Structures are given as C-alpha cells and as structure tokens.
Amino acid sequence: MKEKNKMIKKDSPAASEAACRNVVNEFMVERARRAQSFAMEKPHYHPYYELYFLISGSCRMFIDHTIYYLSAGDIVMLAPYQLHQTLYGSGQPAERFTANFVPVYIEYFASQCSEDGLASIFSKRKLSVPKEQQNYVKELFLQMSKETLSSDCYSRIQLKSFLFQLLTFLGRCRGPEQPDQALDPDDAVIQNAAQYIYTHHSEPLTLEAVAKTVHMSPAWFSRKFHRAVGLGFKEYLTHVRLEDAAELLLTTSLSVTEIALTCGFSNGNYFGDAFKKARGISPREFRFSGHVQAEDNR
C-alpha cells in the first residue's frame, strides 16, 4: 500500500482525491435542527472526539454517568468512547453544530500546548460560551464545515487551523466554574444510580442492590433507568466495565483474565466476547494495536 502511494505525484488529480477522502474520513462537521420528536434510539459512543455546540434551544445530555442541561451557547467536549445521549425539550426546535474528528488532531494539538493544556480543556465537559463570543465560535464551526466540503490539498491545514483556534479559545475561556443547573428529582435519582454503578462496577452488582440505594423497587427502577439513560441496567454496567478494561489493557501488564476479573466480569470468555462485540477486535488485539500506536507516536 505504501509503495502504491509513493507512485502518485503530489500534484496529480489522484493525490487531490486521496487527500479529500482522507479529510472526509478524519473530520466531519454537521449543522442540524432538532425538534422535540427527535430522539437518539439509544446512547452511543465512537472512536473519535466530538465538539457539540448548541446554537439555539435547549436539550438534556447524558454523558457517562452525569446528566447535563444545555442551553444556547453551551458547548460540550466528548472524548473517544464516552457514552452519550441527547434528548431535546419542548418548545422551539433546537439547532446545533457537531464537529467529529480523529484523535490525531488532538495529539498534534497536545504536542504544541502540552498535555496539561489539553487536559484543562476537557477537564469539565460543558462550557457556557459568553454571549458576546458565541458568534465567534459559530463562525469557526462554519469555516470548518466549509473546509470539509473542499476538494483541494489545503483542507487539512485549514481544518487544523480553525480547530486549534477553537480549542485555544475554549482553553482560555475557562474562568471560575459556574454551578450547573439543579437537576429535577427524577434525573437526580438516575444520576445518583449511574454514578453508584460507575464507582462500584468492579463489584458483583445486581439490579436489586442498585435499586435499593435509590429507594426504588427493582421493576420501577429498571423502567426509570432505561427511560432516562437509554440502556438497561445490565447493558450500562457492561459498558462501564468494558471502558475500565480498555484502559487497563493499555496501561497495565495484567493478563486479559486478570483484567476481566478486576473489572467485575465473572470469567474471561464472557469478557472477550463482550469486548469484541463492542470494539470489533479482541482484548489482545486491542492491547497490541494500542502499544504499536504508542511506539509510532514517540
């Protein structure tokens, strides 16, 4: 494959087409209006970063184990494989921008501003952009959107430029943290349950035990949890355990079986099947690919 690419002249139509395809695969910007009737079928996650900017209206977003209420001017930063779901409220339709991009863009940004600089941007998932600066953020999303539709070899350069301007703005925009809007009672109960699961996922949790922590019957809790999160109790617990396992695969020398047991799975075979279903590769393949990528980035 590499030899074939070497034979393409840099100024040839084939090279331009290849560059354009790569940009489309690496970076996508979407602007959409969402009515109350729109709803994600269930929470999802993806192997790339996402910046979500709410232009108008309001919505409710569940991320990992926390519920956020968003209003116009709020921006949310999502890292790869963060579970999330958006629900839109009553009233006027909401309008939002999303920018999705592969980790290589973030890795390059971090190499220029330090890991601490990057961490400060993603340390709090939601940021309220001051009203007088919302048009600036909107314009950056518009410019990125235009570049994803461009067919020349400069698109990637421009995309990096606009994205890095946006990330720099977000990093500098972080002043004293403002308290989040208080959750309504039902959402507060579900968030408490999700956070309990997140904290205790390595233990042999049961639906009955978690329902007891929020003072609900198992049947009622199961219905409320699924309605609010979009996943059943067992599905959500498995997702949390798999994300912990993925981190341990890349950061420890524990065996696959040891990791499975550490994260709360009853046996290695079930863990392997669940991991492959979620990630598309086995735990061992994931560990190997992660280590190879780390070596390539040195």
Region roles according to the model:
Residues Y196-H200, P204-L242, L250, L254, ...:
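Basic/polar phosphate-binding segments, predominantly the helix-turn-helix DNA-binding elements
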Residues F122-Q134, T148-S161, L167-T199, E203, ...:
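Short, Lys/Arg-enriched, Trp-marked, Pro/Gly-tolerant hinge/linker segments that flank
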Residues K2-R33, P80-L149, L167-P176:
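A hydrophobic/aromatic-rich effector-binding and dimerization subdomain
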